[in-house]
Amino acid sequence: MISEIMHPTKLLKGTKSKLLENKKILVAVTSSIAAIETPKLMRELIRHGAEVYCIITEETKKIIGKEALKFGCGNEVYEEITGDIEHILLYNECDCLLIYPATANIISKINLGIADNIVNTTALMFFGNKPIFIVPAMHENMFNAIKRHIDKLKEKDKIYIISPKFEEGKAKVANIEDVVKAVIEKIGNNLKKEGNRVLILNGGTVEFIDKVRVISNLSSGKMGVALAEAFCKEGFYVEVITAMGLEPPYYIKNHKVLTAKEMLNKAIELAKDFDIIISSAAISDFTVESFEGKLSSEEELILKLKRNPKVLEELRRIYKDKVIIGFKAEYNLDEKELINRAKERLNKYNLNMIIANDLSKHYFGDDYIEVYIITKYEVEKISGSKKEISERIVEKVKKLVKS
């Protein structure tokens, strides 16, 4: 009866993205102490939509138990080859093999074609046919001793070595995020299809007074990151242009800029390949003529500001048919005036949607805010966390795109 109930791990599936949706990943665990991190890795793969299976060597059980690994992946854990010919069954079923952690022993045997346990036997099934990701973990001396095997494997088709971190005389297993990113890059779903591509402008830009000092603002970048995560979770392809502030997670492509001019140029360059453009960035309205070197602080200084081009205005001028969404931040206005000013911006730049907020109520960096989501046809007031508000914006954008 209990076997018919869905394993709780399955509830995590796709909670971050659909980048690995419908992908089946076989995780092979060998006897490095880094094996204790494997359940975390499995669950991160699942959060991106993957179905995860697991095989282990006999020695692995001295480091981590089968039940812990079953907890991690939500499926049975295999430790030997039986009459069910598990190495063939799992090869046929799975899209790739991920050996995490990979010991010196297992790496050497795979390169030499030795098949004396379920892990290296299964690896030989995948060898040259489907992707194999190898994540070494061992003492640095051992890594150097088997480097010839690693170098040989690197030359093979469809084998990817995810480099360890060399610290304290050890070749420590790569970060889980780096491992998942590598898997996504090689076997992840191509979500970049027409109607599904979102470009987000995020963070606060800076304008240089000299080579050291800048004029900027207090934008945290949290809203843009929350939006990026929310769109990604719903299966959109997302890229972010970030100035100062929080950057998006590892699985979302990020482009770094600093100034308003850089933000504008990068947005114009990238926007041609996107369907939806959202600017939650606090982009400098003014720039200043920058001085060479570092100005002396001994004398008073008068700065002459000049207007920057409006990024949304320029994007709309160039890209007339794209969905463009802006944000409008004001300070200490009553509700009617805030909405009116946001509507003026909406109409002036011919935006599809604008999100307005009053910074006197919730300042830069606050996690809980109150906003007005405004289109040409409706105004919706919503309060909540930036995560909750982002999810609501995504819902409304999905309806907007369909209409």
Swiss-Prot record:
Region (Phosphopantothenoylcysteine decarboxylase) residue spans: 1-197
Q: Which GO terms describe its cellular component?
A: phosphopantothenoylcysteine decarboxylase complex
Pathway(s): Cofactor biosynthesis; coenzyme A biosynthesis
**Effect seen on changing H87N:** Strong decrease in PPC decarboxylase activity
Q: Which residues form the signal peptide?
A: none
Q: Which UniProt keywords apply?
A: Decarboxylase, Flavoprotein, FMN, Ligase, Lyase, Magnesium, Metal-binding, Multifunctional enzyme
The record describes how the cofactor is bound as: Binds 1 FMN per subunit.
- What GO biological process, any one, is recorded here? coenzyme A biosynthetic process
Question: Where do the segments described as Phosphopantothenate--cysteine ligase lie?
Answer: 198-403
Protein residues bound to CTP: D285, K294, F327
Result after altering E168 to A/D/K: Strong decrease in PPC decarboxylase activity
Record-linked InterPro entries: CoaB-like_sf, CoaBC, DNA/pantothenate-metab_flavo_C, Flavin_trans-like, Flavoprotein
- Please give the annotated consequence of changing H139A: No change in PPC decarboxylase activity
One example of the protein's molecular function in GO is: phosphopantothenate--cysteine ligase activity
State what changing H139 to D/N does: Strong decrease in PPC decarboxylase activity
How this chain assembles, per its entry, is: Homododecamer. The CoaC domain is responsible for dodecamer formation.
Known HAMAP family for this protein? Answer: CoaBC
As for what it does, the entry says: Catalyzes two sequential steps in the biosynthesis of coenzyme A. In the first step cysteine is conjugated to 4'-phosphopantothenate to form 4-phosphopantothenoylcysteine. In the second step the latter compound is decarboxylated to form 4'-phosphopantotheine.
This chain's protein is named Coenzyme A biosynthesis bifunctional protein CoaBC
Q: Specify the species.
A: Methanocaldococcus jannaschii (strain ATCC 43067 / DSM 2661 / JAL-1 / JCM 10045 / NBRC 100440) (Methanococcus jannaschii)
